[in-house]
């Protein structure tokens, strides 16, 4: 089949849907791959690398979409690029919060964010792979912006205590952040409302708390050098850390929110007595790694939906993802 992908149109997106190595494997499977020129520029891959892997590089997005039967993207492209797609094509992307009423195209749509969270679907789970990078890069970002170092150090001049970190949410992002902060030398507490996640906290070397009330959460916030939120959210989710809790956060604490709602701050500005930064896409800070993982997810997905070089969308792992 003909597989195509174009440069991402979201201005802050650094990832690409395919790597040269995955392209090489797809070509070996009998597929044809067509890509827009400079598709991998922001993720560290050159057109010449793609060409050596068997890619056909085309000059425009329209050329790619006019040829491709299967279209792979990180995020859905703007309607101006999809208006001419046909029902014989399939568009595969992370549609996140975009509903069918807000996105109109004649092409079939496969929503990657709806991948079943089961062991048999792990190889195509872009949420898990990207969350892993998000947690690592978010923790690294926090450490970089701190006014102190993390580990306990004993010198002739003085003994430095280990930094104290609170991670809220035992999601994959939260677990990866906890693991990296621990390795960096922090004393880490992982908080989650589900007490069954205590073992997950232990697996990354963190203490565990199931704090849920105002008093319990504010007690956890006190004297922390790092606060990192990664709890699962929905559109109706309430903030876990509210403005009434801000006075309990000590000055110069680095506060990182990897969600839209975990912390009750609307603007992504640091005009508080602590340093605040919100980024739902920390994985974009490591685009080569994030792209490598995404592309391998797509390789496994294509092995499922086009095993004999023709489209088959009847697999139980795929049906929940169809729009």
List the predicted regions and their residue ranges:
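Adenosine-phosphate binding glycine-rich loop
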Residues: 115, 119-153, 261-323
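An N-terminal-biased, well-structured beta-alpha scaffold segment characteristic
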Residues: 4-108
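Glycine/serine-rich phosphate-binding loop and adjoining beta1-alpha1 elements at the start
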Residues: 2, 8, 77-163, 286
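ADP-ribose/adenylate-binding Rossmann-like module
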Residues: 86-103, 108-112, 226-277
